[in-house]
A protein has these predicted regions:
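Signature of N-terminal electron-transfer/Fe-S-associated modules in redox systems
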Residues: 1-160
Length: 160
């Protein structure tokens, strides 16, 4: 068994530190060590996208990334989307467009959509579908999800 390795990172805007075994996955560190259970464990092979988080602003599969690889990084999980108790525009759009059923894929879908809108603030429906194809949903048929992302894009694109 390896010695625990110190790790420091910023999670949802807060500096966090801990010690973990070098082989511990980021998803397990977030869930077990930090108590952030919104990041879901699905396939554990990087296929389903349920474990998607943002690492330094880019979508990453936390089931494929070692926690120590996130040392010094900024990580955003679904718990970090709300600000002062207010839903993020993507979360609000998911609610308004009935873009979830069981909710298992929702955290990964939200963070993947956030990454998509960061790189493409005005995506077409085809671009949204392509951008979200990395996250599997077995309940919704995707139509509500696509509509929600399009609605959020128009909300986020407005001048403030």
């Amino acid at each position: 068994m390896s010695e625990p390795t110190p790790i420091r990172l910023t999670v949802n805007g807060q500096a966090r530190e801990g010690r973990c075994e070098p082989r511990k996955l980021l998803v397990d560190f977030l869930r077990e060590d930090l108590g952030l259970t919104g990041t879901h464990v699905g396939c554990e092979h990087g296929v389903c996208g349920a474990c998607t988080v943002l690492v330094d602003g880019e979508a990453a599969r936390s089931c494929l990334m070692l926690a120590v690889q996130a040392n010094g990084a900024e990580v955003l999980t679904v718990e970090g989307l709300m600000v002062d108790g207010a839903l993020h525009p993507l979360q609000q759009a998911f609610h308004e467009h009935h873009a979830l059923q069981c909710g298992f894929c929702t955290p990964g879908m939200l963070l993947t959509a956030l990454d998509l809108l960061r790189t493409n603030p005005r995506p077409t429906e085809e671009e949204i579908r392509h951008g979200l194809s990395a996250v599997l949903c077995r309940c919704t048929g995707y139509q509500g999800i696509v509509a929600a992302v399009a609605a959020a894009a128009s909300t986020l694109d407005r001048p403030r």
